[in-house]
């Protein structure tokens, strides 16, 4: 009987998701300056824009690249580099250009050739997360279903993977007992990599000190302060010795690598009422960071007074698995997760007065809800070269590259204002 009820609930949920998607699709011309939807061969659990951009002469687009991965059923997995053509400002976006056979938005021009897989490198199991090293973006670290963290220099691998399926990382980083997701390169110390694991620990490696012969590198330091699965870890963006970690013990911990105590953080705070899944330091303000949680909220923190939560962002209907500050705007951050939504928030709007109708759509700081995904969003990334462009990937193989309409974030233009869910006012 329970099975029948579950099947009925699933069918109802699927119908609701499809209806919501139809409404979203109909409203895309009002909501977005760009939408590209691409069905990947396999779902990617990870997404990160590479920092380079190519602007070909005489063309109305620029070429950007993404680090992706695969999560296959039982087939060979790959670390993937893809290229994406983004239109220049003067190229016209035509939201009506929807290819129903491919299930893709062209976004602009014709559909073909906008998103291409450039490099595939054999990987051991699915790619839980992949992140490039800021000082040398050819070097990419990955989290695997085993306990090892792998490091690849993609310039040393052929663009087509070896058919044998053999995974040949340039380095293999040892120290964890279990898999995990959190991964962070130090932006100020080349080669310093942090990793968070289900084994309750955080490992630190320094790959710049590796002898040329050795492929296996042991962790330089293992931090053991958390009492449950460590979900995410992140270096501070300005202080080379500071990093933060969050875990299923509901805590946010701030660590200093100069301290000799690897089992006790500098600060520990009960951050949420459920597991804490992600954190992000603000790139413009050295004291501000955000955490996202299974309690469906994003919390805002000030390192100078962690006893006091600055703000709680509330609109998500389920667990939050990713939070990222905008690289271009100090007050903008985005969050995503199980509810299939990516929310963009604006701190500067906290506390603004709202009409009762507006309040129904969400708090004033909720700038935009991206409703284009019909499955859990696994990861997303702000484009470092094109403001307001985001790539998001979901569990149903879909990758979307999108940019909200300028009138939503530019307050000067009050004409044709659009509420965040896309029902135009």
UniProtKB/Swiss-Prot annotation:
Subcellular location: Nucleus; Chromosome, Telomere
Any one of the GO CC terms: chromosome, telomeric region
Keywords: Acetylation, Cell cycle, Chromatin regulator, Chromosome, DNA replication, Nucleus, Repeat, Repressor, Telomere, Transcription, Transcription regulation, WD repeat
Each WD repeat, start to end: 32-125, 126-175, 176-223, 225-270, 271-314, 315-371, 372-404
Primary subcellular site in the record, as a coarse category: nucleus
Matching InterPro entries: G-protein_beta_WD-40_rep, Histone-bd_RBBP4-like_N, WD40/YVTN_repeat-like_dom_sf, WD40_repeat_CS, WD40_repeat_dom_sf, WD40_rpt, WD_repeat_RBAP46/RBAP48/MSI1
Gene Ontology MF terms: histone binding
Signal sequence, renumbered to the chain: none
Modified residues (N-acetylalanine): 2
Keyword Acetylation listed: yes
Pfam family, one: CAF1C_H4-bd
One GO BP annotation of this record: chromatin remodeling
Family: Belongs to the WD repeat RBAP46/RBAP48/MSI1 family.
Subunit field text: Binds directly to histone H4, probably via helix 1 of the histone fold, a region that is not accessible when histone H4 is in chromatin. Probably forms a large corepressor complex that contains ncor1, sin3a, hdac1-A and/or hdac1-B, hdac2, rbbp4-A and/or rbbp4-B and possibly rbbp7.
Function field: Core histone-binding subunit that may target chromatin assembly factors, chromatin remodeling factors and histone deacetylases to their histone substrates in a manner that is regulated by nucleosomal DNA. Component of several complexes which regulate chromatin metabolism.
Protein name, entry field: Histone-binding protein RBBP4-B
Source species of the chain: Xenopus laevis
């Amino acid at each position: 009987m329970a099975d029948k009820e579950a099947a009925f609930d699933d069918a109802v949920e699927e119908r609701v998701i499809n209806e919501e998607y139809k409404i979203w699709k109909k409203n895309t011309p009002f909501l977005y300056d760009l939408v590209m939807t691409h069905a990947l061969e396999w779902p990617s659990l990870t997404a990160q824009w590479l920092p380079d951009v190519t602007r070909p002469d005489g063309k109305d687009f620029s070429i950007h690249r993404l680090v992706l991965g695969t999560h296959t059923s039982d087939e060979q997995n790959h670390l993937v580099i893809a290229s994406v053509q983004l239109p220049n400002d003067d190229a016209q976006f035509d939201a009506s250009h929807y290819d129903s056979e491919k299930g893709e938005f062209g976004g602009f021009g014709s559909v073909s050739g906008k998103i291409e897989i450039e490099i595939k490198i054999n990987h051991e199991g699915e790619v839980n997360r992949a992140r490039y090293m800021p000082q040398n973006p050819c070097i990419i670290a990955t989290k695997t279903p085993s306990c090892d963290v792998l490091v690849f220099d993609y310039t040393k691998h052929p663009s087509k993977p070896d058919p044998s399926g053999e995974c040949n990382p340039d380095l293999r980083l040892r120290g964890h007992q279990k898999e995990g997701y959190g991964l962070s390169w130090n932006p100020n110390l080349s080669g310093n990599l942090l990793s968070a694991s289900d084994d309750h620990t955080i490992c630190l490696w320094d790959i710049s000190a590796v002898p040329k012969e050795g492929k296996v590198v042991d962790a330089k330091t293992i931090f053991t302060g958390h009492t449950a699965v460590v979900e995410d870890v992140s270096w501070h963006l300005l202080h080379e010795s500071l990093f933060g970690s969050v875990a299923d013990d509901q805590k946010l911990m701030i660590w200093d690598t100069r301290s000799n105590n690897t089992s006790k953080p500098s600060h520990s705070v009960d951050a949420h009422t459920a597991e804490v899944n992600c954190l992000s330091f603000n790139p413009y303000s050295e004291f501000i960071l955000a955490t996202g949680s299974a309690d469906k909220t994003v919390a805002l923190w000030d390192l100078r007074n962690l006893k006091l939560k600055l703000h709680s962002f509330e609109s998500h209907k389920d667990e939050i698995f990713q939070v990222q500050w905008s690289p271009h705007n100090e007050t903008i951050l985005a969050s995503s997760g199980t509810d299939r939504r990516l929310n963009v928030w604006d701190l500067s709007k906290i506390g603004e007065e709202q009409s009762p109708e507006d309040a129904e759509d969400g708090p004033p700081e909720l700038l935009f809800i991206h409703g284009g995904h019909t499955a859990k969003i696994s990861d997303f990334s702000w484009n470092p070269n094109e403001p307001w462009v985001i790539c998001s990937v979901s569990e149903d193989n879909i990758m979307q590259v999108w940019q909200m309409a300028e009138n939503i974030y530019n307050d000067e233009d009050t004409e044709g204002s659009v509420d965040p869910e896309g029902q135009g006012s």
